[in-house]
Design a protein with these regions (language model features):
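Extracellular/periplasmic carbohydrate-active domains that bind, remodel
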Residues: 1-641
Length: 641
């Protein structure tokens, strides 16, 4: 916490150097990851603050802490080649920061970095200031942040993996982004933009997946840059007092352009859409109206349909704007209601057995806070109807079952490390579930909780190939120095691949919301398996990778919406099937991205296979390979029957 540094939080003392030093020290923690807690107060800044990879800034207190860029701070006025998108107040970087050293931008290998529960204000006299550069990858996020850009340039530049519950006021742009570092879609959930001078969002191949956005008092809500094909999905949004155009479009003649907008409420929006170059317009329908469906670009209405470029709009008049409902992503209970598992006796040292401490905590308490640590859990853990497990950093808050555990090995049915009850209203967040390598019956999580449940910011993996091995056996203490990789030890690792069950198993009526999930594990047969449920469910951003057989399987599933589904087929998964759908109906996939890495030496027949399915929608599909060969040798979707 910055309480450990000599800083004043009255907004008069420049704390730039102290804040940078605190971030640097946080980076030096075990695994190069950690949390810097920022107490309530006002923090004056005058220079760029570099946030190292794996480090999270989290504010706390009765009010959010506020970072303020001082008036006329040096360097935030002039536009140079290096500051064409603004000089950044906060810059997420790859690796650590060393004064005078080379600054490496956050990239496809930057994980876990985040900013949560803080506000930012840019004072006058900083016309080229941009609040945040966030070009990062999995489990990186900006969450519960309000940015007052004022007369500065932008709120967020080159966004990454996940943006949630953000509000941006002022600036030329709220968000100005190119594609994310891994080339995947960007999830923007529950956002508010007001008073931008050019547009709320400017995108250049950003692949934005936007749910519940409100843009007010701006010339343009969404602008796609010139000559740039893009995949834009929006649902349940509000445009209000948008003076010029709701959405500026470009390049419909490119098959890569796929725009799908649904349920966009408009008030005082005279022109909903404008196509650049051709000047084709979609005019508004009165003062207050709803765009129920808008399609622009490459489209096929059925498996038998020939894909073609379309422009299609459906509108209806409405009397009033209906407020957006974000009830499916509830806030955590107040911290005063949390019980710290360490206070109950858990060690989290990677050596001690914390199983019974967790079991007793579940019996007695509803809201269990799990601080950073390695918690050894040797038996299955089953939550009660209202149990919440709360972590704040999945890279450093690990529930680990070591290999060869009798409860998860041998013969028998799949056995979950963590199970939620049928119909439960559980919240599970900010933790890492790991069943090591040699646990043949292991499932990381069996989720049967109901529609009101919520999982987010959770990692599933055994992906660190060396971390959990020591002298040819699973490590007694995972914090021991990992073994060196030799031909013999490499064989030990690879023989464990694909021996466990699915990482996340949603079944028996399970549903609810799943946000910012990362499941990457060579040891599991699939990253996600959803089976036998018609309880409504929603996925807001999930990354699946490094599996050998399947990435995701849906069997007998109905009434789900999957936003921002991204698959990375890695070198060990040369014959991996990204998505199988079996006996499913009423599913929507929005911004579906699937790719094979550059190390692949052959194509694969299809990205999606279906059996006996109906009413399945794919709204924006990107199927590609960073390789010498294309992804599919057949088609993106293969209907087996």
């Amino acid at each position: 916490s910055t309480e450990n540094f000599n800083v004043k939080t009255d907004g008069r003392m420049d704390v730039s150097d102290a804040l940078q030093e605190a971030l640097n020290r946080t980076k030096q923690k075990e695994n190069g990851c950690g949390i810097l807690f920022i107490p309530e107060g006002v923090y004056k800044l005058s220079k760029t603050i570099y946030i190292p990879s794996g480090v999270r800034i989290i504010g706390y207190g009765g009010k959010r802490p506020v970072f303020v860029l001082a008036k006329q701070a040096p360097g935030f006025q002039e536009v140079t080649r290096e500051t064409a998108k603004g000089k950044y107040l906060f810059w997420f970087i790859g690796g650590g920061y060393r004064p005078g050293g080379r600054i490496g931008d956050a990239n496809a290998g930057t994980f876990y970095s985040s900013m949560m529960n803080v506000d930012i204000r840019i004072e006058d006299g900083n016309p080229n200031a941009s609040a945040i550069r966030a070009h990062f990858a999995q489990h990186c996020s900006i969450s519960n942040v309000t940015i007052h850009v004022g007369k500065g340039r932008a709120g967020i530049v080159d966004a990454g993996n996940h943006l949630e519950n953000i509000a941006i006021y002022g600036g030329e742009y709220g968000i100005d982004t190119d594609k994310s570092a891994p080339g995947w879609p960007i999830m923007l959930l529950n956002s508010y933009f007001e008073g931008q001078r050019r547009s709320a969002i400017l995108t250049n191949e950003g692949g934005l997946t936007i749910v519940r956005m409100r843009a007010k008092n701006v010339p343009v809500a969404i602008e796609i840059k010139e000559n740039a094909p893009d995949r834009l999905f929006m649902e349940d949004c509000i445009f209000e007092d948008v003076h010029h155009t709701g959405v500026i479009l470009t390049d419909a003649g490119n098959a890569a352009t796929q725009i799908n907008l649904r349920n966009i409420q408009c008030k005082n929006v005279p022109m909903f859409a404008l196509e650049r170059f051709t000047n084709k317009q979609v005019s508004g329908k009165g003062k207050t109206y709803r765009v129920t469906r808008f399609i622009f670009g490459f489209n096929a209405d059925s498996l038998e349909d020939t894909p073609q470029i379309v422009r299609r709009v459906e509108t209806e008049p409405i009397k009033n704007i209906t407020p957006l409902d974000a009830g499916d992503t509830p806030m955590l209970p107040a911290t005063e209601q949390w019980v710290n598992i360490r206070d109950l006796g858990a060690k989290g040292d990677g050596f001690s057995d914390d199983t019974h401490i967790f079991q007793e905590a579940v019996e007695k308490y509803a809201n269990i806070y799990i601080p950073q640590g390695w918690y050894i859990v040797k038996e299955p853990l089953t939550l009660k109807q209202n149990t919440n497990l709360i972590g704040l950093h999945p890279g450093t808050t690990i529930l680990l079952t070591l290999g060869g555990n009798l409860a998860f090995s041998g013969f028998g049915a799949p056995q979950a490390q963590l199970t939620t009850p049928q119909g439960g209203k559980n919240i599970v967040c900010g933790i890492f579930l790991n069943a090591d390598a040699y646990n043949y019956r292991a499932v990381n999580c069996k989720w049967m909780a109901g529609e009101g449940s919520y999982m987010y910011d959770v990692k599933f993996s055994g992906h660190d190939k060396a971390r959990f091995f020591h002298n040819g056996q699973s490590a007694v203490n995972p914090l021991e120095k990992p073994m060196s990789i030799t031909p013999e030890t490499h064989d030990l690792i690879t023989r464990a691949w694909d021996n466990q069950h699915w990482s996340l198993w949603i079944t028996n009526g399970g549903g609810g919301s799943f946000r910012d999930i990362w499941t990457a594990n060579e040891y599991s047969s699939a990253g996600l398996y959803i089976s036998h449920t018609d309880t409504p469910g929603r996925i807001y951003g999930m990354s699946l990778e490094h599996h050998l057989r399947n990435e995701a399987i849906f069997r007998n599933v109905a009434n789900w919406k999957i936003y921002d589904f991204q698959f990375e087929v890695e070198a060990e998964g040369i014959d991996t099937q990204p998505l199988d759908l079996i006996d499913c109906k009423n599913l929507t996939f929005a911004n579906f991205y699937s790719y094979r890495v550059s190390r692949m030496l052959k194509s694969y027949p299809s990205a999606i296979r279906t059996w006996n399915c109906k009413d399945i929608e794919f709204l924006n599909v990107h199927n590609y390979a960073h390789a010498r060969v294309k992804f599919t040798s057949n088609a993106s979707l293969y209907d087996v029957n």
